[in-house]
């Protein structure tokens, strides 16, 4: 048996039909505050592109630098390429992501693995014979 996703006890079908005001009441205070303060031009453009992609009107993949957009139910099943600071990483929005920020799913830093120090990196390495 497959477990159905429910956001705060409400199934996805009801979330799709719910008005934004009722949906905002389900979110945490941080998400509510972000959504009620208004939508910037960058977020508005991304929302329009997501709606066009859902309708099948968009040919190119969606690329964005907007990481602070809160995922809403109508954005589910869309792939968005989010900028990580170096490259665009694809994020396919799933139902479990509703209410989270888009940037939470693209890590901006990674573990650095340094190689061996080169010649002249320190005073003692000057006397190491070259290979």
From Swiss-Prot:
Keyword Transmembrane: no
Gene Ontology cellular component annotations, sorted alphabetically: cytosolic small ribosomal subunit
InterPro entries per record: Ribosomal_uS19, Ribosomal_uS19_CS, Ribosomal_uS19_euk/arc, Ribosomal_uS19_SF
GO MF, any single term: rRNA binding
Pfam families per UniProt: Ribosomal_S19
UniProt record, GO biological process: ribosomal small subunit assembly; translation
Keywords: Ribonucleoprotein, Ribosomal protein, RNA-binding, rRNA-binding
Family recorded in the similarity comment: Belongs to the universal ribosomal protein uS19 family.
Function text: Protein S19 forms a complex with S13 that binds strongly to the 16S ribosomal RNA.
NCBIfam families xref list: PRK04038.1 (NF003121), uS19_arch (TIGR01025)
Protein name, UniProt field: Small ribosomal subunit protein uS19
Native organism: Nitrosopumilus maritimus (strain SCM1)
